[in-house]
């Protein structure tokens, strides 16, 4: 017997039973309604909407695969906001159509491309105005594991003053050059934070306390493009936030699978190099304070 047939049979016998028990008619009606609703409605309709924690998905020309990402995220959390960062493909129309039939999804549009950090700042500023306090950032390309969203959010709710970081676990689909290359950047980031415990500075699947992140971003002109994730992690650690690492599997998609990458090895590695030069200068200037802060954290 199929699941649908099983549910139909249960509802039939429940209804027959209530004919001899009039007081249970209302209960029976709700039971049948729940059977039908659970069978045909997406899980996202059963989610409780958070008043404090929101998911932000910045995207730039992500292709049609962004809908798969958004739907996977919506199954795990509400609300979800997508920030379109000057996209020129047809994904914006697809996202707006999706949001029109999903009250838990909102699409914000920046007409000019400003970079991932710029998109996150735009969405975060609006979210703060609406009373949200924390944001989990998810890449639009589907590499981040949506089923782990409740885990990261729960940890953030338990430790609201911490920076909750996804720590990537790579499989065979991950390009070796990128996996090995990030070790260099992570080494510098850990030095710049006196090895406070950054599991991975480049992985963008993380929960930010938004007020602290907004303050950091408004106090400098950088962190707007590919340098956003690592510089945000370092500067928030400088601000005293404790990093908490949670293992998260990463999946890379080929072009044939709809994967889209805007990473440019030359341009973005130069950007990261310049970022670490700036951060090392800041690290040296702040070293006495950072040492005191680290000692206090170790004693806590």
Regions from the PLM with identified roles:
Residues 61-75:
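Short, well-formed alpha-helical segments that are part of the catalytic scaffolds
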Residues 111-112, 117-129, 146-226, 253-263, ...:
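Acceptor/aglycone-binding surface of glycosyltransferases and processive sugar-polymer synthases
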Residues 64-68, 89-98:
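Acidic helix N-cap motif at the loop->helix transition within catalytic regions
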Residues 132-141:
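Short beta-strand-to-loop acidic/aromatic patch adjacent to the donor-nucleotide binding site
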Residues 38-50, 219-300:
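Hydrophobic helical membrane-anchoring modules
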């Amino acid at each position: 017997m199929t699941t649908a047939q099983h549910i139909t049979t249960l509802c039939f016998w429940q209804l027959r039973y209530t004919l001899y028990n009039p007081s249970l008619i209302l209960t029976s009606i709700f039971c049948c309604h729940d059977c039908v609703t659970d069978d045909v409605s997406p899980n996202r309709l059963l989610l409780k909407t958070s008043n404090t924690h929101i998911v932000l998905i910045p995207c730039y020309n992500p292709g049609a695969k962004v809908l798969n990402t958004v739907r996977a995220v919506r199954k795990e959390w509400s609300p979800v906001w997508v920030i379109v960062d000057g996209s020129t493909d047809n994904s914006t129309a697809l996202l707006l159509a999706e949001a029109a039939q999903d009250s838990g999804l909102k699409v914000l549009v920046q007409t000019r491309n400003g970079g991932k950090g710029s998109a996150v700042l735009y969405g975060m500023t609006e979210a703060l105005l609406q009373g949200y306090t924390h944001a989990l950032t998810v890449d639009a390309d589907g590499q981040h594991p949506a089923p782990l969203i409740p885990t990261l959010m729960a940890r953030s709710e338990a430790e609201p003053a911490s920076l909750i970081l996804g720590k990537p676990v790579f499989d065979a689909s991950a390009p070796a050059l990128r996996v090995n290359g990030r070790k260099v950047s992570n080494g510098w980031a850990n030095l710049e934070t006196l090895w406070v415990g950054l599991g991975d500075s480049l992985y963008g699947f993380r929960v930010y306390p938004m007020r602290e992140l907004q303050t950091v971003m408004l106090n400098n002109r950088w962190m707007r493009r590919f340098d956003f994730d690592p510089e945000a992690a370092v500067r928030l650690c400088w601000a005293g936030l404790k990093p908490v690492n949670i293992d998260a599997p990463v999946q890379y998609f080929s072009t044939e699978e709809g994967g889209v990458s805007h990473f440019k090895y030359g341009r973005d590695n130069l950007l990261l190099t310049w970022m670490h030069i700036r951060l090392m200068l800041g690290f040296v200037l702040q070293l006495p304070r950072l040492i005191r802060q680290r000692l206090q954290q170790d004693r806590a």
